[in-house]
From Swiss-Prot:
Pfam family, one: TrkH
InterPro entries listed in its UniProt record: Cat_transpt, TrkH_K-transport
Descriptive protein name: Probable cation transporter HKT2;3
Domain of life: Eukaryota
Function according to Swiss-Prot or TrEMBL: Probable cation transporter. May be involved in regulation of potassium-sodium homeostasis.
Any one GO MF annotation of this record: monoatomic cation transmembrane transporter activity
Location within or outside the cell: Membrane
Domain notes: HKT transporters are proposed to contain 4 pore-forming regions enclosed by transmembrane segments with each containing a potassium channel-like selectivity filter motif.
Positions in the Cytoplasmic compartment: 1-32, 117-164, 258-296, 374-400, 495-509
Cellular compartments per GO CC: plasma membrane
Keywords attached to this entry: Ion transport, Membrane, Transmembrane, Transmembrane helix, Transport
Length: 509
């Protein structure tokens, strides 16, 4: 028995070492695009297999493979579109989707990027630390060469800052997820209206608390309820809790990260050297979410102003409409705030998007298509670091038609045309539901990694097919598409996720 145990331990150790070597080789020798694509596809396939193997809670429901692959891709790309009713899934399947959203979230990938960059810094010492030969030179030559050599203290402190950031980001994620889950669980336990909804739907309260917190913090958008947060539209406290978690994991993360570092420096919980260096030389650290002071302030002001403007416009267009039916003035403002935040990030909806004024839907579509300020700031820093000449050389080497074909506008136009071709029969027989605008809205939502959808309503059908009854299904608009249309949207999800540069945290210097 001890011999078998020894063989098992040695085999396990060999397998772990081999896996670590393969991961290091891939991380150090492949391009970031190939690494991200491989990571997404591997997690996506594993998630798809897990969802297929596990059985739904509704034993009469047998989901198609296309729908399960669509759902797995939606979770991996943290979009939140679903072509099935979420309440038909079992608790184990909801747990798998929650894990997929976390593993492929921009926050977790940023953490992995920090860990990888820190390990690179530790593994490869700078060349100026190695003494290959000693040459006798004049004092004047030594004085001229000295300023060109980077300071050893500067290199060491950058290494320590990366290690420091690894622990800060890890603690940040753990605290937000644990605290958020506990707060949501406590709210549900003490507010009868929210608790009754979960009881009526037979959803585990603890699982819902964890799933909705992970979904909000990672901007995943997949919730265990069929109607997303529409059933909680009257629960102001719950919506405000989720708004804070969404902002903490997305656009305002650079603001909160800088506040955390500033607080740690003030509390003197660690050496003051690392926080001071990061506060004063944030761009030198190489973490795209750690912005300089002025950019952080500008980001906070612009995001708050943008959300406030959206709330005002949304309320003006929908205040007395059926969108806010049965809600008080405070609940209307809270729901407008929730929608304004989600139109940029998580894609969770507390109202029916099909009832929203067309002008507000156009505004949402623009918000979904517009990149975040963090991405723009990161691109500006990379442009300053690399220089404008490289951009000129790159642009000259690419033909105009090739650039247009792979641009977001060209790609989305192609996807919209393909979906219109695959759904051309439904476009002619059901023009109110399968309108061109709804298709454009769905494609932009998928490519922008948001997840808002106009849905589908049997009451809007103009022609009822004989012998075929239309049943209301609480899932996204793409759930009514054909299988080729769904697969095209899956491609849009993956390309939109790969095009997002927010997942790249530690830039190679």
């Amino acid at each position: 028995m001890p011999i078998r145990l020894h063989i098992f331990v040695n085999s396990a150790r060999h397998a772990i070492n081999s896996s670590a070597f393969i991961c290091r080789f891939i991380a150090y020798h492949l391009s970031p695009l190939l690494i991200h694509l491989s990571y997404f596809l591997i997690i996506d396939i594993l998630g798809f297999v897990s969802l297929v193997v596990l059985r739904p809670s509704n034993h009469k429901y047998n989901p198609r493979y296309v729908d399960m692959f669509f759902l797995s891709t939606s979770a991996v790309t943290v979009i939140g579109l679903a072509t099935i009713q979420m309440e038909d899934l079992s608790s184990s399947q909801i747990a798998i989707l929650t894990l997929l959203m976390f593993l492929d979230s921009k926050m977790f990938l940023s953490f992995l990027g920090l860990v990888l960059e820190s390990s690179k810094q530790n593994k490869h010492d700078p060349e100026n630390r190695r003494v290959s030969s000693v040459t006798v030179c004049k004092q004047s030559q030594l004085e001229e060469a000295t300023p060109q050599t980077p300071s050893m203290n500067s290199i060491d402190i950058k290494k320590r800052c990366l290690k420091y950031l690894v622990f800060v980001v890890l603690a940040y994620m753990i605290i937000i997820l644990v605290t958020g889950s506990l707060l949501v669980f406590m709210y549900i336990a003490h507010v009868s209206s929210a608790r009754d909804v979960l009881t009526r739907k037979s959803i585990n309260k603890a699982l819902f608390s964890i799933s909705v917190t992970v979904s909000s913090f990672t901007n995943g958008g997949l919730l265990p309820t069929n109607e997303s947060m529409v059933v909680f539209s009257s629960n102001n406290g719950l919506l405000l809790l989720l708004i804070g978690q969404i902002l903490a994991g997305s656009t305002l993360f650079p603001v909160f990260l800088r506040l955390v570092i500033w607080a740690l420096r003030g509390l003197r919980l660690a050496k003051a050297e690392e926080p001071d260096f990061m506060m004063n030389n944030s761009s030198a650290v190489g973490f795209s979410h750690l912005l300089p002071n002025l950019q952080t302030i500008f980001l906070a002001v612009v995001e708050v102003a943008f959300v406030a403007m959206t709330v005002i416009l949304f309320c003006c267009l929908n205040w007395d409409s059926v969108v806010f039916a049965g809600l008080s003035s405070l609940q209307k403002i809270t729901n407008a705030l929730f929608m304004a935040v989600n139109a940029r990030q998580a894609g969770e909806n507390s109202i029916d998007c099909s009832l929203v004024a067309p002008a507000a839907l156009v505004l949402f579509m623009v918000m979904m298509y517009t990149p975040s300020l963090t991405k723009l700031f990161s691109a500006c820093q990379d442009h300053k670091r690399i220089g404008p000449e490289s951009d000129d050389r790159t642009s000259k080497g690419k033909p105009f038609l090739k650039m247009m074909a792979f641009s977001p506008l060209g790609f989305n136009t192609t996807v919209i045309m393909l979906v219109c071709i695959t759904e051309r029969r439904s476009l002619s027989t059901d023009p109110l539901n399968l309108s061109t605008f709804n298709i454009i809205f769905e494609v932009i939502s998928a490519y922008g990694n948001i997840g808002l959808s106009t849905g589908y309503s049997c009451s809007r059908q103009l022609q009822h097919q004989e012998g075929i009854a239309c049943h209301e299904k609480a899932y996204n608009f793409s759930g009514w598409w054909s299988e080729p249309g769904k697969l095209i949207l899956v491609l849009a999800m993956l390309c939109g996720r790969l095009n997002s540069k927010d997942s790249t945290s530690a830039r190679t210097r």
